[in-house]
A protein has these predicted regions:
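Structural signature for solvent-exposed beta-strand/loop edge elements and short helix-capping sites
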Residues: 3-176
Length: 176
């Protein structure tokens, strides 16, 4: 006959995330059967020490990934750009994707405060130790970091938050 087995322990998949993911949206949330969620309008995700706010967030819990971007308003200005905050710092960007499990991400249009200045960049890849690699970056101490009067143009850089910035070829740009 058949031997009856009692299930005494649920085997969690190695890909499972370790904590509850809290999420909200001011406008709407669309949840699908495939463990995916689309959040619209002042969206927020809170997971362990990570916080993400953006106008639009797409989340897939099967692959442990999240994608965030701003949305155009009635005159075409992008509003609600992603703001990512964790133990290593706070980052604003145009778009970002992030994996909860590996703690790695890909960011475009990054803006972050480092030491006494601002680092902005075209593309950045965040590593699991909190450091990130930036391509086509700018470092300035000018308060107007969107259109600085002076900056160091960095072809590539590795940033270790609150420690140092190591760059490849770079040059100083002065504007009138």
């Amino acid at each position: 006959m058949y031997k009856r087995q009692l299930l005494t322990k649920i085997n969690r998949d190695a890909n499972d995330i370790k904590s509850t993911v809290n999420f909200s949206a001011k406008d709407s949330m669309v949840l699908s059967k495939g463990n995916a969620a689309h959040l619209y309008g002042e969206s927020a995700i809170d997971y362990q020490d990570l916080k993400l706010n953006s106008a639009e967030i797409r989340m897939n819990l099967d692959s442990n990934t999240v994608y965030a971007n701003g949305l155009p308003d009635s005159v075409g200005q992008i509003e609600g750009m992603p703001v990512f905050k964790d133990k290593s710092g706070e980052y604003e960007s145009k778009t970002m994707s992030y994996n909860f499990k590996s703690e790695r991400g890909y960011i475009t249009g990054i803006v972050t405060e480092q030491q006494d200045g601002y680092l902005t960049g075209g593309q950045a890849k965040r590593m699991d130790d909190g450091s990130f690699f930036v391509q086509d970056g700018k470092y300035t101490t000018c308060e107007n970091h969107d259109d600085p009067h002076f900056y160091f143009q960095l072809t590539k850089a590795k940033v270790r938050p609150q420690k140092d910035v190591v760059t490849g070829p770079g040059y100083m740009v002065l504007m009138g």
